[in-house]
Amino acid sequence: MREQIEGSRAVAHTVARCRPEVICAYPISPQTHIVEELSRLVKTGELAPCEFVNVESEYAAMSVGIGASATGARTYTATASQGLLYMTEALYNASGLGLPIVMTVANRAIGAPINIWNDHGDSMSQRDSGWIQLYAEDNQEAVDLHVQAFRLAEELSLPVMVCMDGFVLTHAVEPIDVPEAGPVDAFLPPYEPRQVLDPDEPVSIGAMVGPEVFTEVRYLAHARQMRALELIPEVAAEFSAAFGRTAGGLVRPYRCEDAETIVVALGSVLGTIKDVVDELRDAGTRIGVLGVTSFRPFPLEEVRAALGHAARVVVLERALAVGIGGIVAANVRMALSGIHLHGYTVIAGLGGRAITKASLHRLFADAIADELEPLTFLDLDRALVERELHRGRTERRPGPSAENMMRDLGPTATGIG
């Protein structure tokens, strides 16, 4: 049913209609409204049978999720930022044990320095943890990806992260078609676990594995992800047929057919990029954008097919691999191995910095003129950086860089001026 609703609440109601049996979570902004609404639904009996487990930390949340899933319960949790990092050890256990947990990641920057706003640094840090990672462009897709995520997780015996931009999506109130229970039930059958701890049929899971088998175990994890490359578009097509709208899949090209310049991005920034692409197209510029929905597994063949004819590719990403640069860009380069074109990595929107149409127009103009550096930081205040570098060279104890630069900016740094 289409209604005016906050993104977080829409996700919560959609998760409820997927009929989880155990929800375990610890609140952290900007994920909090999701789990608050789910706890309310459990308390009022609107979501039943379901146990909501209040835990003392994010590590505990994932640990409880592992136990619940291992005993055959459909399991859900949500987190963000430092909470996701706190879960890291347990995340690897969940995927290594083949447990189909679904988790919402309300993407938020990671510290230090502390920052509560949006970028993709949190989920990108877990790209090799064995979880499927799906990135939503808007709140409608965030809702729809959760329905698909439970189906994917349970068919593949793999956990799935649905990543949605914190605050930009989680706290946005807009018209969203929240799926009704009946169609969700038809699309998502009752959970039948492939492995379960059962006292009547005792087994152990997570046993120690020696060198003679460990490589094969890891290969199977990779093989399941490769199977996901086939299943993700199949499930997306079934969803489209059942619900009458498109969501999910591996990648989504927009005006790429004859494009000389193609931008690659994930998440909510795609909407702004599409607006700029339309404006440039109206002016005669052959440009397009490729939205990546599935970052893990990464769709090498589909990315290569979409980008291989372009003269240049601009990868715009909201996370930074310190010491090398782009994360998404490294995967795109692998997809384009052997193809000669101009490639640019652009780090943008870190810590919630706005990515404006004006900035994108300037960026794309420089890219089309092949005047970009291979690694570019969008709207970087170079004077501010140079002052801090000079301070570090000339003072024995210059103080914390973040605080120094905030002082240099003055009242505008805190939004006072």
Language model: regions and residue ranges:
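Redox- and metal-dependent alpha/beta enzyme cores, enriched for Fe-S-associated oxidoreductases
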Residues: 253-285, 298-305
